[in-house]
Amino acid sequence: MHMKPIYVIPLAVIVVLIIADQIARKRSIDKATRLYASGRFSDLVDYLDSWYPRLFYMSYIRQRMKFKAFEAMGKTDLAEDCLDLLFASSPAKAQLADLLIQAFTFYMSSGKFKKAEEILARIEENPDLKDAAPELRKVYEIQAKGDSSHIEEMETQVSKASGADALRLYLLIAKQYENKGDNEKADFYRAKAKHVNS
């Protein structure tokens, strides 16, 4: 059975429009990625507020990109506003787990320990993050509360660690020695961390 020409033309137009839309979306995402990668964070925010991303990006993705840009620019208040919008958007289960980790990291690095503790409580209640929660609790206690009770444990762990794990452990050990007032040991472990990072 052959389709009548009158039906073939609209079908062809629809297919062309779908392909054109997919190409436009890919180019748009590529442009946003390039702006971020090249450190043009202000330009990225302007682009994300332009008509095409506002119309065609999922709101969650657009806000997340803006959060990352504001965080990179050091605009803490604007980044925090984006986080509030992201949490208010009722993210999917996997998105929420990722968002909680990002929010915890952001608040800890910004020195907003009260907010970090609130997020940590949510992390500890989230079954998808049960493996990460104890380690994040240690990070919080070390950085926000001046804890130094994990030195021996972490020194044992770091002897078998490499890459990002070793870097994280060296920095946490250094912070604990700093908390104890042993600046010589703190400097020693910071130097080790710098060596891993180079």
Each predicted region: which residue ranges?
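N-terminal signal-anchor transmembrane alpha helix of single-pass membrane proteins
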Residues: 1-31
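Generic helix N-cap/helix-start motif at coil->alpha-helix transitions
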Residues: 20-30, 55-64, 92-101, 127-137, ...
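Alpha-helical repeat scaffolds
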Residues: 43-51, 76-88, 112-127, 148-162, ...
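Alpha-helical oligomerization segments
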Residues: 170-198
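Acidic, Ser/Thr-rich low-complexity segments on the non-lumenal side of membrane proteins
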Residues: 44-74
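Short juxtamembrane segments adjacent to a transmembrane helix
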Residues: 29-50
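Structural motif corresponding to the intra-repeat A-B loop/turn of tetratricopeptide repeats
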Residues: 38, 73, 110, 144-148, ...
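Residue-level signature for tetratricopeptide repeat
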Residues: 30, 34, 65-72, 105-106, ...
